[in-house]
Amino acid sequence: MAIKRVAIVGLGLIGSSIARAIDERLPQVAVTGHDASDDVRGVARDLGLCDGIVDDPVAAVADADLVILAVPVGRMADAAAAIAPGLKAGAIISDVGSSKAGVADALAKALPDHIIIPAHPVAGTENSGPAAGFASLFDGRWCIVTPGAGVSGDAVAAVTGFWQALGAKVETMDAAHHDMVLAVTSHLPHLIAYTIVGTASELEEVTESEVIKYSAGGFRDFTRIAASDPVMWRDVFLANKDAVLATLQRFNEDLTALQQAIRRGDGAKLEEWFTRTRAIRRSIIEQGQDDAAPDFGRKH
């Protein structure tokens, strides 16, 4: 099937980046945008995002071949219900949420299973809002597609081709497996970052000014992650709680083992652990998933 018109519901970082990428790389595709926030719609209009920004979600999806819900995962069910009356026959519904099994269930409450193709572009920054988006956000990044059993191959191919056209590498995956993988690679790191920064800010022995003044590179990396949209991440943790809790349990066990090694003065254990985990970093660089520049390419 050909995608000639796309509707984007939600014009934050991801939604606005999709709009910009379509404009740059798929200029023949018409784009209509909608956001529940009056302020966001106003900014989107000022920025010239999409071919049109509309106030009504039903009007936004009219005649769209592909509808992308770029809203926090906790709002997926409401967003699906809002657009359902305006969908044309044959339209595909997708999303960009960081959890997939729960999103699929939420969408299915308002929409037929056979038109839902959940997707997760594994890309982003700590910034949010329509002004934060940029067309190259998805370049070389993975987009994981988790179609249900009843979806046609043509529809899956259309969504796959769409994301590839925006610069992404596409992988098809079972929704539950996606949620476990992302709990390890994305959700738990964000939870740890929020915790470390929160702990540092509450230590009575260290003032906030000292935390800011003497922050080393590692701590600054955590603060960058902790600057991410709190509403979005609140919803992600709640939507993917089973996988997050399972991963957090394993992390706590490993952390306890390291705590015991430090207490015992077991340098061999610490070095073995650090050496093994260092290899993961090298593999990420080798696969082009990050910058090999010294100090993560940080400018001083």
Spans of features found by a protein language model:
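Rossmann-like NAD(P)-binding element
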Residues: 57-87, 91-92
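Interdomain hinge/lid region at the active-site interface
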Residues: 208-276
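Phosphate-coordination loops involved in phosphoryl transfer and adenosine-cofactor binding
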Residues: 3-5, 90, 140
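Glycine-rich, N-terminal phosphate-binding loop of Rossmann-like dinucleotide-binding domains
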Residues: 70-72, 97, 147
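NAD(P)+-binding Rossmann beta1-loop-alpha1 motif at the extreme N-terminus of oxidoreductases
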Residues: 1-56, 61-62
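Rossmann-like NAD(P)(H) cofactor-binding subdomain of soluble oxidoreductases
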Residues: 79-131
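Internal alpha-helical scaffold of NAD(P)-dependent oxidoreductase catalytic cores
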Residues: 137-224
